[in-house]
Amino acid sequence: MANNNLKKLLLSPISDNNPIALQILGICSALAVTTQLQTAFVMAIAVSLVTAFSSMFISMIRNYIPNSIRIIVQMAIIASLVILVDQILRAYVYDLSKQLSVFVGLIITNCIVMGRAEAFAMKSAPLESFVDGIGNGLGYGAMLVIVAFLRELIGSGKIFGVTVLQTIQDGGWYQANGLFLLAPSAFFIIGFVIWAIRTWKPEQVEK
C-alpha cells in the first residue's frame, strides 16, 4: 500500500497533475531556459533536486517550526539549497551556468518549490515529501524538455547543439524559424501541449 502511494506521488505530477500544464506554475523559467535542450535538462535537474531535498528537510522539522515564521524557514532552506546548486554549476559547468543566468537563483521563488513545501511537506512524512518533490520536478522537467526540443529543432534545426536539419544558410534545405528562439513561442507550445493533454484526459478540463 505504501509503495502504491509513493508510486502515485512520483508519477501523478507528470501527466495527471502537471505543475505547468494543469497548475500553471513555473511558467517564467519555462519561457526563459527552453531555447536549448541542454539548458532545459540542467534546469529540470536543478529544480527536481531543490524541490525534493527542501521538501524532505522541511518535513523533518515541520513539528518544530513556529507557524508565524514557517514561510521564512521554508525560504531559508530553499535558498540554501539553491545557492549550493548554483555553486556546483559554476564550478563544473560554468558555460551552462552563464546561459541559465539569474534563473537558477530564481528557483528560490519558484511557485512549484514553495507550493510543495507549504501544501505537502508541512503535512507529510520525509520520504513521501522527498518522492513528491522528485515527482513534481519530473513533471516540470518533462514540460521543459518538450518545449525545448521543439524550440531548438524548429528554431535552429539542432538537438543538443548537433545539426539534425541542415539549414539553407549551411547549404541544406531547412529554413529555420527564428520565431521559435524567442520567448513568446514557448507560450504557443505550452498552450498546444495543454490542449493535447486535456484532449487526452478530458477530466482535466475546468468545468
Curated annotation (Swiss-Prot):
Keywords: Cell inner membrane, Cell membrane, Ion transport, Membrane, NAD, Sodium, Sodium transport, Translocase, Transmembrane, Transmembrane helix, Transport, Ubiquinone
Top-level class of the enzyme under EC nomenclature: translocase
Membrane-topology descriptor: Multi-pass membrane protein
Keyword Ion transport: yes
Subcellular location, record wording: Cell inner membrane
Transmembrane spans: 20-40, 41-61, 69-89, 102-122, 130-150, 177-197
Catalytic reactions on record: a ubiquinone + n Na(+)(in) + NADH + H(+) = a ubiquinol + n Na(+)(out) + NAD(+)
InterPro entries (alphabetical): NqrD, NqrDE/RnfAE
Catalytic activity, EC: 7.2.1.1
GO biological-process terms attached to the record: sodium ion transport
GO cellular component, one term: plasma membrane
GO molecular function: oxidoreductase activity, acting on NAD(P)H, quinone or similar compound as acceptor
Subunit structure: Composed of six subunits; NqrA, NqrB, NqrC, NqrD, NqrE and NqrF.
Free-text function comment from the UniProt entry: NQR complex catalyzes the reduction of ubiquinone-1 to ubiquinol by two successive reactions, coupled with the transport of Na(+) ions from the cytoplasm to the periplasm. NqrA to NqrE are probably involved in the second step, the conversion of ubisemiquinone to ubiquinol.
Protein family per UniProt: Belongs to the NqrDE/RnfAE family.
Name of this chain's protein: Na(+)-translocating NADH-quinone reductase subunit D
Native organism taxonomy: Bacteria, Pseudomonadati, Pseudomonadota, Gammaproteobacteria, Pasteurellales
Primary gene name: nqrD
